Amino acid sequence: MSRRCAITGKSAMNGHSVSHANNKTKKKFGVNLRTIRIKLEDGSTTKIKVAASTLRTMKKASK
């Protein structure tokens, strides 16, 4: 399974690590994934991987 958010589709992106001397090396910025359980309409539960930013938005929307 890929490291991708199941709801928004967010995945890792590429960039540079920049040192104090301004040397640049390639770096991969990963997604902060969390495994959560959600209840489906039929009453069963399933596990999905969700980005932490998506989880925060979901919690804000449920208030």
UniProtKB/Swiss-Prot annotation:
A matching Pfam family: Ribosomal_L28
Record bears the keyword Membrane: no
Record Gene3D superfamilies: Ribosomal protein L28/L24
A GO cellular-component term linked to this record: ribonucleoprotein complex
Keywords: Ribonucleoprotein, Ribosomal protein
InterPro entries named in the record: Bacterial_rp_bL28, Ribosomal_bL28, Ribosomal_bL28/bL31-like_sf, Ribosomal_bL28_bact-type, Ribosomal_bL28_sf
Molecular-function annotations in GO: structural constituent of ribosome
Biological process, per Gene Ontology: translation
Annotated TM spans: none
Spans annotated as Disordered: 1-22
NCBIfam families membership: L28 (TIGR00009)
Database matches in HAMAP family: Ribosomal_bL28 (MF_00373)
Family the entry assigns: Belongs to the bacterial ribosomal protein bL28 family.
PANTHER family associated with the record: 50S RIBOSOMAL PROTEIN L28, LARGE RIBOSOMAL SUBUNIT PROTEIN BL28A
Protein name per its UniProtKB record: Large ribosomal subunit protein bL28
Species the sequence originates in: Campylobacter hominis (strain ATCC BAA-381 / DSM 21671 / CCUG 45161 / LMG 19568 / NCTC 13146 / CH001A)
